[in-house]
Amino acid sequence: LHADLLPHDRAVGSNRDFLALRHDHNLTRGWTGRLNVQRASDDNYFRDLSTRVVDTSTTNLPRDGELRYGNENWIFSTRVLSYQTLQDPDPTKRIEIPYRLRPQLLLLGNKPGYYGADLNLESELTQFDHPSKTNGQRLLIYPSLSYPMANNFSFVTPKLGYHYTRYKLTDNFSGDSQLTRGMPIFSVDSGL
């Protein structure tokens, strides 16, 4: 926890503060949680009160939370992310507000050595929103199968997978509210 407080700053006529809470926690076997929440009282807080360039150029303060489970074959996580955007005082230099993730669900699977093959799964479901842009949901699924073959002097690993992505959009200005893409992927990794 980090907190700064400047009571009744005469230059602006109000209290000014900055708060940063960062916490990583091992909950139970395989489960972890993480928080990174930051806030500033006003857009000019760092420009007025910091002497470090890294602080004075800060524009987005994260508000990020994640709950994760993992074992030797699976990882599952759920995450929410938004930002406090500190605007430039010059109205011609407005800073674009980033998208919020509410929530982002992730499932990764890996089963090496399954009858000689390695099975993998990457999947993600994300609800993203923005106050003035297209909002929506993205689904990504990428299962793959690879078959590593090696001897003392070389290796060859063919891999076959299918990458599927679906977007379901609202407030979409292009007209299409549902977009999908599926692509088979084949690769070979080899070496001596």
Placement of each model-derived feature along the sequence:
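Outer-membrane beta-barrel proteins and related beta-barrel translocases across Gram-negative bacteria
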Residues: 1-192
